[in-house]
């Protein structure tokens, strides 16, 4: 519409699932209240321009999955399935200055989500860098020189880093356009450690509540149960992923093919899995084969991966007795 406007000078300078977020809080005042009816746009706002959809997309680039140039059959639909929301909150249990002005906070266990860090009295324009890791370098001879530092090798090409530029006064670091899988968060750019209670982790998931509980007299079995539910929560984030931390986080069909039955016992994931099965149909090959990865498409798995196009709808029906997914999916 001709009345639409846009602004490309807000505080979010960069946002990436793998690489993290860059946020300049010095720009907060310019955008304050922008999403309310009372907001009056300033000179930073420009008339929106309609741009033609040129070029093409590919469902995968694999054989039998041709380039897509015709978008006439594509349509917007309302979102369904469990949304991603905050389901838990952790507080750092310790902090260690592993190098001068390099502070590593321990959240107590691996988590999937974003930090929420309280600051006060910072000099305006201070650049604070946060990096995330699941483990630290252990005290072993081969890691001499790195002991105590966060280990990033298993994160691979993901930067897993957030940068926050302070405005001064009381403020909160709380990224919106990324997420991380981590236990340890390294903070640099501050002269002294923040109190552990100022460093929190907001746990995100598409599983809002678990429908099952399990407890025995064996503490190891109880811990295994907690590991299962915690890992399920961390890997059910919009899509069922293979991992929450490195430069992958993909909807590998083989993983959910073998786990879907367990998932249906743990929680009501009927709409979550319905959405995933639809994404499998969206990138289904012309010869009928389901992809190994959805919604991205492609992959290099075997029959087990594509079999999710059969096993997941069936497990949902077996658990929930709802035939709608079968009706939607049967022709595929």
What does each of the following model-derived ranges do?
Residues 250-253, 331:
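An alpha-helix initiation/capping motif
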Residues 1-245, 254-255, 271-274, 290-295, ...:
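Extracellular/oxidizing-compartment recognition motifs
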Residues 118-120, 188, 227, 231-235, ...:
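Generic, well-ordered alpha-helical scaffold segments in large soluble proteins
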Residues 252-258, 265, 302-306:
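An alpha-helical repeat/solenoid feature that recognizes helix-turn-helix modules
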Residues 140-154, 270-332:
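Helix-terminus loop motifs that line ligand-binding clefts
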Residues 245-250, 299-302:
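A glycine-rich, coil/turn loop motif that links secondary-structure elements
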Residues 21-24, 33, 247-248, 266, ...:
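C-terminal capping/lid segments that line or modulate ligand- or cofactor-binding pockets
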């Amino acid at each position: 519409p001709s009345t639409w406007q846009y602004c490309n000078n807000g505080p979010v300078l960069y946002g990436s699932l793998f690489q993290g977020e860059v946020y300049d809080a010095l720009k907060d005042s310019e955008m304050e209240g922008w999403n309310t009816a009372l907001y009056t746009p300033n000179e930073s706002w420009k008339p929106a321009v309609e741009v033609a959809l040129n070029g093409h997309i590919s469902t995968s680039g694999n054989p039998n999955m041709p380039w897509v140039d015709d978008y006439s059959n594509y349509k917007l639909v309302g979102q369904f399935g469990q949304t991603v929301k905050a389901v838990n909150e952790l507080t750092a249990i310790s902090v260690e200055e592993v190098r001068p002005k390099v502070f590593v906070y321990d959240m107590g266990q691996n988590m999937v989500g974003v930090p929420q860090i309280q600051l006060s009295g910072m000099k305006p324009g201070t650049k604070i860098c946060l990096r995330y890791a699941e483990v630290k370098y252990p005290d072993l001879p081969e890691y001499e020189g790195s002991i105590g530092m966060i280990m990033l090798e298993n994160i691979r090409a993901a930067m897993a880093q957030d940068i926050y530029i302070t405005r001064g006064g009381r403020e909160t670091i709380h990224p919106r356009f990324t997420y991380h899988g981590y236990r340890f968060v390294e903070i640099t750019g501050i002269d002294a450690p923040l109190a552990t209670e100022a460093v929190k982790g907001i746990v995100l998931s598409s599983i809002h509540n678990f429908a099952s509980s399990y407890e025995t007299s064996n503490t190891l079995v109880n811990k295994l149960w907690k590991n299962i539910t915690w890992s399920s929560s961390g890997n059910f984030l919009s899509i069922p992923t293979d991992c929450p931390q490195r430069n992958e986080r993909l909807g590998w069909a083989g993983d959910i093919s073998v786990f879907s039955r367990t998932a249906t016992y743990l929680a009501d994931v009927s709409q979550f899995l319905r959405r995933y099965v639809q994404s499998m149909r969206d990138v289904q090959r012309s010869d009928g084969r389901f992809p190994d990865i959805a919604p991205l498409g492609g992959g290099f798995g075997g029959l087990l991966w594509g079999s999710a196009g059969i096993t997941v709808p069936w497990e949902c029906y077996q658990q929930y007795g709802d035939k709608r997914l079968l009706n939607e999916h049967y022709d595929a």
